[in-house]
Amino acid sequence: SSAASDVYKRQDLDIYTGVAYGLKDVIIDQWIATHKEYEKKDAKTVYYLSMEFLTGRALGNIIINLSACKEIKEAIEELGLDLNVIEDQEPDAALGNGGLGRLAACFLDSLATLGYPAYGCGIRYKYGMFKQKIVDGYQVEVPDEWLKNGNPFEVRREEYACEVKFGGYTRWVKGEDGRERVVQDGYRSVRAVPYDLPIVGYGNNVVNTLRIWDAEPVQHFVLDSFNKGDYIKATEEESLAKNIVEVLYPCDDHYAGKELRLKQQYFFVSASVQTAIKKYLDNHDDVRNLPEKVVFQLNDTHPTICVAELMRLLMDEYDLTWDEAWAVTTKCCAYTNHTIMAEALEKWPIELFSKLLPRCYQIIEEIN
């Protein structure tokens, strides 16, 4: 009966979850040890910035890389179950779509297996692209709810949450030291919260990190608006934040879609660069030496706002001059080109870009 089959499906899902959490316990110790080793060696770290990471299912990959296949297969078979059926309970991580994302995932695998310090940095999409259904012989696109049962391998890192600002205007202010600095006012902001996923190297006890960012409102619920009967305004900030992480490549043949894509790109780049600089400054004093320990690898055009954002942070937050910031930025950013097709090389209307990212637009004008 269908009720009985639902029970068996649930049982398989519960066993998958149990195996995943058991493996995660093993991985966590290696994960911590890996990062302690990198810190001890003061190793240079690559941050691989990409809109996509097509990692596939984690469980099977982790079992192989830990060389634990025989033991886990035997344990599962003792329960009268099939490891392949258990692995099938895991949804594909809806974090990528094509070659761009597969390349990113392959690089992360390879970097971990070779023992290089590396972070993948991207977005924790709620739905990814879409799930295909065929109805009456035609494709129907439905949301891919890959996170509906949670992701047992992810770790929420609240302590690394940071603010990302959109819109507003810039003005110059003179500090107590007499130097003029740019500040941004009248902006709207969202809170970027990272979720870390383990990238397990093959047979070497190395566990690197894929850090995917979720967007949350700075204030979840405005009680004052709700009490005045403005129910939409009460949750407006939440809606604005959640839109950023709903889908990979939202439709951009209208203004709102273009704006959302640019928001997505700036959101994860700003959060990743902010945390990379803070991590560097935990153990080093002079941000001008950043290129000795940090490099940002930009996977195609989507994360290239990194150049302007790094300049912005170095000048406006860390008080470097233009020339000092430029010397750091040119040594810190590397780029992977995927295509020269005109339609794939992104362009943004100046009016949209300057309104959404006013300070980055000023910096790009100055670079030009």
Short names for language-model regions:
Residues 21-87, 225-243, 267-288:
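Conserved oxyanion/phosphate-binding beta-strand-loop segments in alpha/beta enzyme cores
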Residues 156-299, 348-368:
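Active-site cores of enzymes that catalyze phosphoryl transfer or operate on phosphate-rich substrates
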Residues 97, 113-196:
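Extended, regular secondary-structure scaffolds
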Residues 107-131, 321-341:
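Glycine-rich phosphate/pyrophosphate-binding loops
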Residues 3-8:
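Short, small-residue-biased leader/transition segments that mark boundaries at the very start
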Residues 43-47, 51-53, 296-309, 332-339:
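Core structural elements
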Residues 66-87, 91, 131-160, 227-231:
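Compact, glycine/acidic-enriched structural inserts
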Residues 307-366:
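Extended, well-ordered alpha-helical scaffold/bundle regions in very large, multi-domain proteins
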